[in-house]
Regions:
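Domain-level signature for soluble enzymes in the chorismate/prephenate branch of the shikimate pathway
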Residues: 1-366
Length: 366
C-alpha cells in the first residue's frame, strides 16, 4: 500500500505562519532602513523627498508579478501603508482636505496617501488650495465630480486664479452606511446626515425606516458625531466615521444607486513624472465666434488623442466669456500630446496645462 501524505496539523501550520510573520517583520525593517538611506541621499542632492511616480511604479511592478492567491487590490493597500509608514520615518506628508474628519474626502485622502500622512481638515475648497499654495501642506485633496451630482464647479473655478498643478486623481465609491452607538435598528428614533446623503438613501430609508425623522447635518461626519452622543440617533456616514466615533454599523451600502462614485483631485506645486498610464488636464479660453471650439479641438482629433472630458465655466471676467476644461489620455512628456497642445494654443486666447498625472483605474469600495 502507498503511504498517504499526512495532512499538517493546525499547530504545525500556525507555527509556519509565525515563522513567515517573523521573516516579514525583518524584511519590513530592512526595507525601512533602505528608505532612510534613500532619504539621506535625497537630502544630500537636494531632491524632493516624495516621488509619487516611483510609488506608482512599485505598485504596478508588484501587481504584474503577483501570482496569487493573495489579491492585487489587497496587496496594493498593504504596500501603500508600508510606503506611507516608511516616508513618515523621514518626514510625514502634510495633506489638506475638505473637512471635517471622517468625511468621504478624508477617506479618499487616506486611501491615496496611507494612514501615516498628517491630515489637516480645512473648512473650504479655497482653504485647501491656500494651504498648498502658501506651503503649509505638501498636497491638497478636493472633490471634482460625482457620478450622480455632476461636476464640482467651485473646484474648477479655483484653477482660474492659481498656479497649482494636478498631481493625481482618486476615485472613491461613495458607500453610505447606517451607524449608531448600539448597532440596533429597533432603537433608532431619528437619523442624521448631510442632505445629499439623505437624498441618496431616500428609497432605502422609506422602505426600511418608515416614519423615522430625517434630520440635516452639515456633513456626514458631523452626523456621526451627533449619533455618538445620542443613544436613539443614527447617522448615515462612511465606515471611517464609524471608526472615528466608535459607532456600530447597522447596515452597509444603503444608497439607492450602487454605482455612485466621486472623483477627487490631488493638488500640488508640480505634477509627477510620466508613469506610462497618465492623464493630462488643460484649461483654455477662446474667441466667441462660430466654429472656434471645433478649430481648437481639431488638432487632438488629427493626432488621435482621446479626450475623456470637456467642461465649460463662465470666466467671471467678461460677459459670455467661457473657460474650457479638457482631460485627455497621455502625458505632456509624450511628443504627441505636447505637439497637439502647441497647435491648440494658436487658436486660444490663453491655455494652461493644469497637470499630467497617473490615471486611477481602481474604484475603491468602502
Amino acid at each position: 500500500m502507498k503511504n498517504k501524505q499526512k495532512t499538517p496539523s493546525l499547530d504545525t501550520i500556525r507555527t509556519e505562519i509565525d515563522t513567515i510573520d517573523t521573516q516579514i517583520l525583518k524584511l519590513l525593517n530592512k526595507r525601512a532602513q533602505c528608505a532612510i538611506d534613500i532619504a539621506g541621499i535625497k537630502r544630500t542632492k537636494n531632491l524632493k523627498f516624495h516621488s509619487p511616480e516611483r510609488e506608482r511604479a512599485v505598485l504596478d511592478r508588484l501587481a504584474s508579478i503577483n501570482k496569487g492567491p493573495f489579491p492585487n487590490d489587497a496587496m496594493k493597500v498593504i504596500f501603500r501603508e508600508i510606503m506611507s509608514a516608511s516616508l513618515a520615518l523621514e518626514q510625514p506628508l502634510k495633506v489638506a482636505f475638505l473637512g471635517p474628519e471622517g468625511t468621504f474626502t478624508n477617506l479618499a485622502a487616506v486611501r491615496h496617501f496611507g494612514s501615516f500622512a498628517q491630515y489637516i481638515p480645512v473648512e473650504s475648497i479655497k482653504a485647501v488650495f491656500d494651504a498648498v499654495e502658501y506651503g503649509e501642506c505638501h498636497y491638497g485633496l478636493v472633490p471634482i465630480e460625482n457620478s450622480n451630482e455632476g461636476v464640482v464647479s467651485y473646484t474648477l473655478d479655483m484653477f482660474m486664479d492659481c498656479e497649482l498643478k494636478i498631481a493625481a486623481e482618486v476615485l472613491l465609491e461613495v458607500s453610505h452606511n447606517l451607524l449608531s452607538k448600539s448597532g440596533e435598528k429597533s432603537r433608532i428614533k431619528r437619523i442624521y446626515s448631510h442632505p445629499q446623503g439623505l437624498a441618496q438613501c431616500r428609497g432605502w430609508l422609506e422602505a426600511n425606516m418608515p416614519g423615522v425623522p430625517l434630520l440635516d447635518a452639515i456633513s456626514t461626519s458631523k452626523a456621526a458625531e451627533i449619533a455618538a452622543a445620542d443613544d436613539e440617533a443614527a447617522a448615515i456616514a462612511s465606515e471611517l466615521a464609524a471608526r472615528l466615533y466608535d459607532l456600530k454599523v447597522i447596515k452597509r451600502r444603503i444608497q439607492d444607486k450602487k454605482n455612485n462614485y466621486t472623483r477627487f483631485l490631488v493638488i500640488a506645486k508640480e505634477s509627477p513624472k510620466k508613469t506610462g498610464s497618465d492623464k493630462t488636464s488643460i484649461m483654455f479660453s477662446i474667441n466667441d465666434k462660430p466654429g472656434a471650439l471645433y478649430e481648437v479641438l481639431y488638432p487632438f482629433k488629427q493626432t488621435g488623442i482621446n479626450l475623456t472630458k470637456i467642461e465649460s465655466r463662465p470666466s467671471k471676467r467678461r460677459a459670455w466669456e467661457y473657460i474650457f476644461f479638457v482631460d485627455m489620455q497621455g502625458h505632456t512628456d509624450d511628443e504627441k500630446i505636447s505637439s497637439a497642445i502647441e497647435k491648440v494654443k494658436k487658436n486660444c486666447l490663453y491655455l494652461t496645462v493644469l497637470g499630467s498625472y497617473p490615471v486611477d483605474a481602481r474604484l475603491y469600495k468602502r
